[in-house]
Amino acid sequence: MIKLRLKRFGKKRETSFRIVACNSTSRRDGRPLQELGFYNPRTKETRLDTDALRARLEQGAQPSDTVRTLLERGGLLTKSVRPAEVIGKLKQEEARKKEAADAKAAAKAEAEAKASEAAAAAAAAEEAPAEEAPAEA
């Protein structure tokens, strides 16, 4: 199977990557079948050989996640929703719903506590013996 992935080159801490087509069993920096582009993550510079990339994709080459993102930005692939993104969004949505429900329950409990406190204060006021006003002389 042919994979489209990044091949690292450059100095330490100043890396750049070549987008290459290679066998899926070959090493990351091994000899590629074909060089298809360039990507510099520091300057966000990207150069793509669009004709060669289209040909490799039509032959069934599978891009890595990073290369897929670069191809989507370059307009060679349509943005697709990946299962991991869907799962992440669903978990976030569930967390938001749970947080909203917890906040609602806390507000309800607080309102009930205030109501019972007010009722207790009113009952205490009714039960307290009324003090007589001192007689005016």
Swiss-Prot record:
Residues 128-137 have a biased composition (Acidic residues). One of its GO terms (biological process) is translation. Residues 93-137 are annotated as: Disordered. GO terms for molecular function: structural constituent of ribosome. Keywords: Ribonucleoprotein, Ribosomal protein. PROSITE patterns: RIBOSOMAL_S16 (PS00732). InterPro entries: Ribosomal_bS16, Ribosomal_bS16_CS, Ribosomal_bS16_dom_sf. Residues 116-127 have a biased composition (Low complexity). It holds the Pfam family Ribosomal_S16. The keyword Ribosomal protein applies. GO terms for cellular component: cytoplasm; small ribosomal subunit. Residues 93-115 have a biased composition (Basic and acidic residues). The keyword Ribosomal protein applies. Belongs to the bacterial ribosomal protein bS16 family. HAMAP family: Ribosomal_bS16. This is Small ribosomal subunit protein bS16. It comes from Synechococcus sp. (strain RCC307). The lineage of its organism: Bacteria, Bacillati, Cyanobacteriota, Cyanophyceae, Synechococcales.
